[in-house]
Amino acid sequence: MPFSLGQRWISDTESELGLGTVVGVEGRMVTVLFPATGENRLFSRTEAPLTRVIYNPGDTIESHEEWSLVVTEVEEKDSLIIYHGTHSETGEQVSLRETLLNHNIRFNKPQDRLFAGQIDRLDRFNVRYQCQLLRNKLATSDLLGLQGPRVGLIPHQQWIAHEVGQRFAPRVLLADEVGLGKTIEAGLIIHQQLLTGRAERILVIVPDTLRHQWLVEMLRRFNLRFSVFDEDRCVEAYADNDNPFYTEQLVICSLDLLRKKRRLDQALDADWDLMVVDEAHHLEWSEEAPSRAYQIVEALSEEIPGVLLLTATPDQLGHQSHFARLRLLDPDRFYDYQAFLKEEDSYKDVATAADALASGESLSDESIAGLTQLLSEKDISASIALIQDDSADTDTRLQARDELLQDLLDRHGTGRVLYRNSRASVKGFPQRNLHVHPQKMPEQYVTAYRVSAMMNKHLDTNAKVRQVLSPEKIYQDFDSGSASWWKFDPRVDWLIDFLKTNRSKKVLIIASQAETALSLEEALRTREGIQATVFHEGMSIIERDKAGAYFAQETGGAQALICSEIGSEGRNFQFASNLVLFDLPLNPDLLEQRIGRLDRIGQKNDVEIHLPYLANTAQERLTEWYHQGLNAFECTCPSGHILFNEFSGELLETLLNNDETSLETLLDNTKARYQELKLAMEQGRDKLLEINSHGGERANKLVQSLADKDGDTQLIGSVIRLWDIIGVEQEDSGENAIVLHPSEHMMFPTYPGLPEDGITVTFDREMALSRDDIALITQEHPLVQTGLDLITSSETGTTSVAVLKNKALPAGTIFLELIYLADASAPKSSQLYRYLPPTPVRVLLDKNGNNLSDNVTYESFNKQLSAVNRHIASKLVNASQAILHPLFAKAETFANAELQTLTACAREKMTSQLSGELERLKALKAVNPNIRDEELSHLSEQMSELNRYLDSSKLQLDAVRLVLVSHA
């Protein structure tokens, strides 16, 4: 290499040293000083890993005094370069010797890095291109936000998330029956809103007992890192911000925290995008006296654009309570309870028409007339004719029915704000089997009852009944708090025998009181050494989590988990299928809540319900009322609260007095009323709302699309190559699992999301669902997203040189492959990525500037290429400079033409989708007042914004590869 003092060179292996200056040439050695770092390097003149830095006309360069020059002419004098051009600030014609160039110069543009000899390995160029394709594929996916969560692909859950998650500032009521997965639906919506940029700041309000469970669920299932806020956390946060809620984007807190005026004011001022309220049916409301909890949520809902309320079903709540929730979502729309009742009555015609369509049978003249009247603004005669035509294709007829159902759904009063699935409309639940185990009443309890009756005459009936349902509690109170009752209670003997007989089975035991649960654990431990753990409201959240994890362990874990009534709220243990009810709650909803701990979506076995009770006592009579009157053990009973309210007086008297005649009368009356309510509910079932909530065939197709994405071999290959390039150690763990560890040779100093001690991952959804300790990898997982960002935001793979061995082409033939990114700068919330995400534009030029990319695919071209030593690659680039410079300008012309096409297609797609949706919503607003003005104005504003962003779309060269033909 010809070296001269003062020349500027850059190190091919240590580009971070900046621009070097030749300060010594002696014999076969050359000394280069790198002024930016003050370091010297000594190189062999013949094999120095150095590249001469020479700029070209049009380049902008910077002097060591930090003024810039646009180069117009390059002069070589005495082996040194002098640049002539225009001063960027003054416009004067100036000259700059290369010795006076800025030392801190870095080559960021791919073409600059190529000519400066900063050439990457061939595999890195390939991985970079695959990363850009993956990012584009994810951004344009219709399933964005649904693929990543570690949840089962259950149709109604995915459907609700798909429908609600795509809305701007959704305000909906999720009112599925117990066990159908409202928390998962909310998590899916949150995940989708965050990933699509529709929301950034989210507040989740839950009962105090569920805060940690939500925290764990959001992280384990959705990879979302929420922060739990309590008073202590708020005080700590003052060091960072006057408003503690601004210190985190994703926050979970309890209503109790917000009861303090100061904290509520801070929450109101925190600019949330979405609020989620769990157990919203506990928010008590009446027109005269709404509760404090209701007022807190109401104040927040007036400030926060998006609101999700998770609540019990309207059937369980009663109409006024249901109206109160809807009022939180849209107070202008749901302003008067009587008007709401009247409006609901008018939906019966819509529901009747929907029943006719959903039945799949031929439509009667009455049904056709009803449909025609309801959909009077459009001509449906062709669709009706098609449905009635038995000779028509089955799929075509089904499509016609579906379209008419969709039209009816759009006109349904609460169809856009209420989602309610019931077990009647969702399949896949296990059988529930009741096993009763009557036990003889011990004498100790008989005595305790007698004494209690004499001493507690002042108590009201309700309090007396609660006492007689828990004889162990009465005995403890009279025995100075001693817990010795378990030594003679026959229910405990039965429980021990049951656990010994079923040692291999996990058993959940629920009792009303925490004291009872603790005593039972002591009994099992001291009498038989049975491994059991307790779960009650006196334990901290972390203690409860540990107890739950101990119970869940297959090997070495507890056989039994003993829960108190309050302690078990919100916890699910569907890996167990045996439930022991040590006593019974005096409330049908609480009974269902107990059974619902096991009877949930995901339960793979029948739920066996065991009920040991004391014969000829209030326990037996309550068992009979629940079983014979309500059928509440083996089926869900939505009318349970109604029946309890209607018969509570008679029930309480019957429980206190052992009167067989009264009991028979009560059972007969309850059973008759139960059948009456069941029939009324069946007839009044809102089939249209059910169709909208579970999605029908559309939900099944959605789930099938998601299932097809699972195990995508192309994705798996791309992700594994990505981890290889970054330097992540991958150890096969068997059973479709891989253990990832940071290696000593990581390309980047940190890889966010990859723990130092490693993480076990799988691409198999079923495995991830069966193992809490294994992460599910999809293209939405943070480990994949972070990996893509690390590569695409760095210079990795932006340049490469390769050899094409093909004797059909003349040796020395040159090809220049350029990867541009077509993009437009816009905030994520604008949703521009749906129409013009960063899109790779490939241009492949021969030496004459002909674009061959349409005829030669990337894959076929790449397979024929071989890597080149970096030193040789640098020489090849230098030798080809004269040919390459004009090709860059030519390539940009081709890429710009493609950009215009992409922008036009994006604009057409955006206009078609959004204007179509806008017109549809405007038309529907005339027949369905649930269409909010905010949705219409947001769509109009979004279209204007997107057009502006598309006007500013641009190209950026992302990577370049020089390819030379060789016959060697």
Swiss-Prot record:
Domain Helicase ATP-binding: 163-332
Coiled-coil positions: none
InterPro entries in the cross-refs: Helicase_ATP-bd, Helicase_C-like, Helicase_RapA, P-loop_NTPase, RapA_C, SNF2-like_sf, SNF2/RAD54-like_C, SNF2_N
Keyword Aminoacyl-tRNA synthetase: no
Transmembrane segments annotated in the record for this chain: none
Residue ranges constituting the Helicase C-terminal domain according to the UniProt record: 491-678
UniProt-annotated binding residues for ATP: 176-183
UniProt-listed Pfam families: Helicase_C (PF00271), RapA_C (PF12137), SNF2-rel_dom (PF00176), Tudor_1_RapA (PF18339), Tudor_RapA (PF18337)
DEAH box, short sequence motif: residues: 278-281
Enzyme Commission number(s) of this protein: 3.6.4.-
GO BP terms: regulation of DNA-templated transcription
Gene Ontology MF terms: ATP binding; DNA binding; helicase activity; hydrolase activity, acting on acid anhydrides
Top-level class of the enzyme under EC nomenclature: hydrolase
Keywords: Activator, ATP-binding, DNA-binding, Helicase, Hydrolase, Nucleotide-binding, Transcription, Transcription regulation
HAMAP family: Helicase_RapA
Family: Belongs to the SNF2/RAD54 helicase family. RapA subfamily.
Description of how the protein assembles with itself and partners: Interacts with the RNAP. Has a higher affinity for the core RNAP than for the holoenzyme. Its ATPase activity is stimulated by binding to RNAP.
Function: Transcription regulator that activates transcription by stimulating RNA polymerase (RNAP) recycling in case of stress conditions such as supercoiled DNA or high salt concentrations. Probably acts by releasing the RNAP, when it is trapped or immobilized on tightly supercoiled DNA. Does not activate transcription on linear DNA. Probably not involved in DNA repair.
Protein name per Swiss-Prot or TrEMBL: RNA polymerase-associated protein RapA
Source organism phylogeny: Bacteria, Pseudomonadati, Pseudomonadota, Gammaproteobacteria, Alteromonadales
Gene that specifies this protein: rapA
